[in-house]
């Protein structure tokens, strides 16, 4: 089966919709997380992904990203200072979900998400941390490339790790990931492939223009 993998949508619904026009519904659609924040349409993106998974339950795989992870900390009241979350795209996400939002009512907004958008929050909370398909290891951020067994990677590292690709890939698998914009790695937005061809980054930085 062919795979169609999309990374780091970040609320850019129009671009996401355009990309989906190239998806053959016979192929497996894999969403690498970071569906929310930064762009104006986080709610619409989440709704679209939920609808796709409901319509094609065997053809749509959804992974969690670090931005979904931050959202869970926010709605669960585990975030001591929400400022970094809010200035890193969280406020755009809140505006997308909550109309007539009071941006100063941080705790109240979290409660609205938990109560009025429980289905969306549960969907994001229950997204996978990784997906293995044959010789492909598909993650949001990467994996612990210093561990003897990649499956010992913490959930935190699957979502947040940086520069794991600087270490040799000893898994025997090809790791496809996002999280780090490819322009930070080779100064262009095209996919980046490591010299050993066992690491592939597909985060084209759509939300950055």
Model-inferred region functions:
Residues 5, 29-31, 62-63, 137, ...:
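Residue-level marker for buried hydrophobic side chains located in beta-strands
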Residues 10-11, 37, 69, 143, ...:
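Short, glycine/acidic-enriched loop or turn micro-motifs at the edges of active sites
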Residues 16, 41-42, 72-74, 148-150, ...:
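Short glycine-/acidic-enriched loop or helix-start segments at secondary-structure transitions
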Residues 25-27, 57-59, 134, 171-173:
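A general structural motif
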Residues 38-128:
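Active-site neighborhood of divalent metal-dependent phosphoester bond hydrolases
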Residues 95, 100-209:
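Acidic, His/Gly-enriched loop-helix segments that form or flank divalent-metal centers
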């Amino acid at each position: 089966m062919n795979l169609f993998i999309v990374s780091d949508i970040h609320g850019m619904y129009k671009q996401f919709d355009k990309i989906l026009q190239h998806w053959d519904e016979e192929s497996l659609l894999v969403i690498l997380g970071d569906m929310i924040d930064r762009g104006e349409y986080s709610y619409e993106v989440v709704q679209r992904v939920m609808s796709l998974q409901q319509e094609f339950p065997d053809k749509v795989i959804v992974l969690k990203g670090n931005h979904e992870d931050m959202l869970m900390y926010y709605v669960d009241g585990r975030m001591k200072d929400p400022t970094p979350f809010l200035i890193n795209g969280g406020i755009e996400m809140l505006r997308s979900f909550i109309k007539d939002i009071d941006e100063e009512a941080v705790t109240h907004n979290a409660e609205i998400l938990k109560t009025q958008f429980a289905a969306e929050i549960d969907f994001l909370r229950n997204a996978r941390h990784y997906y293995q398909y044959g010789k492909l290891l598909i993650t949001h951020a990467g994996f612990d490339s210093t561990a003897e067994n990649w499956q010992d990677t913490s959930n935190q590292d699957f979502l947040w790790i940086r520069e794991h690709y600087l270490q040799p890939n000893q898994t025997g698998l090809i790791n496809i990931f996002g999280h780090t914009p490819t322009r930070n790695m080779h100064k262009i937005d095209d996919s980046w492939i490591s010299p050993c061809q066992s690491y592939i980054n597909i985060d084209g930085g759509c939300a950055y223009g």
